[in-house]
Amino acid sequence: MAEWHKIIEDISKNNKFEDAAIVDYKTTKNVLAAIPNRTFAKINPLITNRNILKPLIGQKYCIVYTNSLMDENTYAMELLTGYAPVSPIVIARTHTALIFLMGKPTTSRRDVYRTCRDHATRVRATGN
């Protein structure tokens, strides 16, 4: 099993990011790790299943920017918050979990994408 809490701890130390969570989408469909008392800590199993159709994350509406979540080469979805100030969000898929990462409004979309994909790639390399 991947060390989910270490990934969240690493992300929370970086001042560029506002929120992060890791959600199991294969078996239990619950939050495995998250920054406490933030939006993504409120993700529930229904959100995990329907997120591709109507993006509502932690009770916040989002706009899909790109969706390659099911592509085995890309395995990521980029979104923007549907309210001001606009923040970039990336969801990356490992073999067993989804990694949710939201940048601050001043953080570039590419920084959020790169960080989320890097974590997912490392976890995928371990087989999780």
Curated annotation (Swiss-Prot):
InterPro entries: PFN (IPR048278), PFN_euk (IPR005455), PFN_sf (IPR036140), Profilin_CS (IPR027310)
The keyword Transport appears for this protein: no
Keywords from the UniProt entry: Actin-binding
Molecular-function annotations in GO: actin binding
Keyword Transmembrane helix: no
Entries under SMART domains matching the protein: PROF (SM00392)
Alphabetized Pfam families for the sequence: Profilin
Gene3D superfamilies: Dynein light chain 2a, cytoplasmic
Segments passing through the bilayer: none
Protein family: Belongs to the profilin family.
Function field: More likely to influence phosphoinositide metabolism than actin assembly.
The protein's name: Profilin
